Amino acid sequence: MKSRESLIRLRKFQVDEKRRRTVQIETMIAEFERMSGELEREVKAEQDRAGIQDPAHFAYPTYAKAAMGRRENLKRSTDELRVQCDDAKAALGEAFEELKKVEMLDERDQQREKAEANAREQNELDRIAAMRFTANGAHA
């Protein structure tokens, strides 16, 4: 029984770790998207300031080119994180299923033990009742 409790604690710990990892990745994705949006606004502002919208133009602002490059890097990183997030969610689902299996086994064992205890108690009560009946039957 002790080993089952340890296994349940282990499975809960694994679920918590996988949940934390998933949240961490989702937070990183949100942060990268926020940063990408800021870079997009900065590029637009720089283009408006220079009056040049075409990145191929010889006088296109250097800062805008650099910001576009950083934005593209962030988008690639975000895409990679989305794949990691999907994998983390799948791992979380598997860990949760493993936890549920162990908890169900534990619950089934507890129900069986309770039924056995109830049966023992009922047998003891039946034995006592039979002794009383025999004792009272002998006096009548």
Where are these regions (language model features)?
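Charge-rich amphipathic alpha-helical interaction elements
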Residues: 1-140
